[in-house]
Amino acid sequence: MRRGLVTFAAGGLVSAVTAVVMPENPVFCGVLTFMGMATLLSVPVKSLLRRIPPQLGLALSIALFMLLRDVNDGFLGFEGVRIAAIPDGTDWFTAVLGFPPPGFHSSDYFPLLPWLFLFWTGVFLSRLRPERDDLLLRPIPLFTAMGRHSLLIYLAHQPLLYALMPAVVKLL
């Protein structure tokens, strides 16, 4: 629960900063916000997800992801195969669900639909992997440190790239 709240809050911070610093390209419902929401929404249904056989859960999650892949563009279907049209969203709340209103723009947009089903695909895949303690015999300190600080690294990468790009352009 804590991890979901922290990730969701980090996504809110990114949204607030981009709304001020880059108002022409704000981030609304970006990947961090989504991952926080998906984690928080998965907590109350965790026991239900565990009761679903992993092969069935994997197949259903993939099928629902594919069916809902293009809801953001106003139809059910996958990669341009239009099964049925769906109405536009009406506000920010419907945009979070996956139904953006006309004129909606976000430079990073990962709404609950369809992405929650891809998230749950990972949940079911993790249950299918064999249990092996010897998969990585000894930890690699650099990777361990990066894993412990991955949110901070993610939050720092964009401002760092924006700061370095003018120097890189001058060198070219």
Question: What residue ranges belong to the model's regions?
Answer:
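Alpha-helical transmembrane segments and their immediate juxtamembrane cytosolic regions
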Residues: M1-L172
